[in-house]
């Protein structure tokens, strides 16, 4: 297999490393306009180019788009026009969605969208518990981390999360909403308030408080921020006879035992991998699982867990939260 990685920053390098773990024989080709990044990947033993046009001549079987979201549309379009099965990181904006979906169908090409949290073992357990409970629940969820700490090796000003269209809070909603909508269902109504409390050089709000009412009667409160000094992912789900707790990592998932009145630890991973450069709530296993899902979709063995069609709805909720018409 020959794989093209477009965008050789931290995420592109992660995809290379994980892809080689899935298939050590895979041939990697990299594309990036920055010479320094190309040199780093060439030192890893991989061929690189400065343009997709050059790389497409190598006839890759699949491509992974790991650039800033605002650049995705143009890149994905070129890849699909070259009939390359394409995996893309979160888009956060719906630029060209209808065109890209139609182009993929016309060229019989896979168009696959990342949604890593759907592959987390803890959230699969929570999803199963909530659906088996089969009654409305209440949930409280806080997700946050101080923006400069996301990529401590570079300035947040040079990172797409400083762009108002793809800002840090929107990125967090883009990561979390797909699993929330899968587990709790479509949204009937929402109310959101936001403001800015930090001294960061940004032109968007840095904290959001959102109340969601789902069509099935479930209600939830979500707090998202780019303020918290310690990375936070805290979830509590409760109903009459159900109480779940999760602190964002595989070592912190609990279900309340109504008989013993104790919290029972739920183990969803035999082993899990973690990149020490990131907070402890980022688990590598989920990234591997979604990449394997993509490769199996290309091979005709599986259906994707997420799609551009589903993401259009997710983005519509994000736009409502941010007050975008």
Predicted regions span which residues?
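Glycine-rich, N-terminal phosphate-binding loop of Rossmann-like dinucleotide-binding domains
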Residues: 66-67, 143
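Beta-strand-loop-alpha-helix segment that lines the small-molecule cofactor/substrate pocket
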Residues: 62, 68, 73-118
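Short acidic low-complexity segments
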Residues: 46-58
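Predominantly a Rossmann-like dinucleotide-binding segment in NAD(P)-dependent oxidoreductases
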Residues: 117-193, 198-201
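C-terminal helix-rich "cap/oligomerization" subdomain common to oxidoreductases
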Residues: 62-65, 286-325
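Contiguous beta-strand/loop segments that form the cofactor/metal-binding neighborhood of enzyme cores
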Residues: 172-252, 281, 288-301
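N-terminal Rossmann-like dinucleotide-binding module
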Residues: 1-44
């Amino acid at each position: 297999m020959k794989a093209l990685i477009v965008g050789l920053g931290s995420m592109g390098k992660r995809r290379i490393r994980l892809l080689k773990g899935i298939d050590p024989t895979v041939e990697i080709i990299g594309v990036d306009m920055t010479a320094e990044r190309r040199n780093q990947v060439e030192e890893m033993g991989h061929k690189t180019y400065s343009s997709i046009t050059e790389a497409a001549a190598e006839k890759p079987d699949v491509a992974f788009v790991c650039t800033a979201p605002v650049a995705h549309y143009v890149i994905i379009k070129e890849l699909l026009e070259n009939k390359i099965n394409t995996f893309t990181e979160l888009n956060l904006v719906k630029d060209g969605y209808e065109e890209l979906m139609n182009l993929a169908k016309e060229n019989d090409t896979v168009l696959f969208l990342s949604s890593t949290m759907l592959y987390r073992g803890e959230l699969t357990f929570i999803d199963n518990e909530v659906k088996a409970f089969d009654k409305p629940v209440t949930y409280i969820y806080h997700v946050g981390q101080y923006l400069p700490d996301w990529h401590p090796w570079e300035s947040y000003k040079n990172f797409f999360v400083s762009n108002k269209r793809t800002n840090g809070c929107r990125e967090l909603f883009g990561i979390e909403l797909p699993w929330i909508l899968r587990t709790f269902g479509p949204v009937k109504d929402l109310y959101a308030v936001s403001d800015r409390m930090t001294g960061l050089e940004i032109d968007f709000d840095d904290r959001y408080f959102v109340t969601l009412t789902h069509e099935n009667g479930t209600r939830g409160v979500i707090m998202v921020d780019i303020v918290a000094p310690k990375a936070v992912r805290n979830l509590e789900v409760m109903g009459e006879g159900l109480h779940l707790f999760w602190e964002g990592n595989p070592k912190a998932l609990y279900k309340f035992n109504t008989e013993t009145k104790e919290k029972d630890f739920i183990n969803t991973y035999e082993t899990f991998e973690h990149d020490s450069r990131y907070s402890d709530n980022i688990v590598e296993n989920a990234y591997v699982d979604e990449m394997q899902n993509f490769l199996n979709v290309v091979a005709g063995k599986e259906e994707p867990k997420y799609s551009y069609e589903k993401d259009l709805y997710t983005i519509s909720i994000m736009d409502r939260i941010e007050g975008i018409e």
